[in-house]
């Protein structure tokens, strides 16, 4: 074999060697990308699960959420403390505690909306908020979701799947002063039903003989 032939063979062999290296690099890169994507997916899924838990709200927005977590973790039938620091005879009068017992979380009621969360985040960072936060009506609670009917905050397919007519029948046992009979117009659910403090029978503002459910407050007592 001449010198030229030997050089040609060497050149061919030299040119053939990089190909496997390139393939190996691509394989390693592919494996790395798969691992990175897998980690991101798992981390993202874990974050979403944590995001829906009450301790997420408390961990991220430490100060404004501090008064709320105990009302959620309280045990119905036992004394508790409401978000204002008032003693509550029975935590069962606070809907946050009741909802916790059936597996509901903060996000089941307070469905997160990006623009609303951004506004709240800015208020938290700037310190421009009240603590505890002001109480909002059902209308205000569904406003960010674009819902026109505030009843949907409570009466929907995943929570209380019935309308006001059926609701009125469910409380017929309360007699002539049935809080769900619209003799004075339809009231918002949140007028009586409170999540983070003892619920109130608003009817007792005028009807002092109205039935006050166990552990609830009369209108007068709620103002003390």
Segments (PLM) and residue ranges:
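Short sequence/structural segments immediately N-terminal
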Residues: 2-224
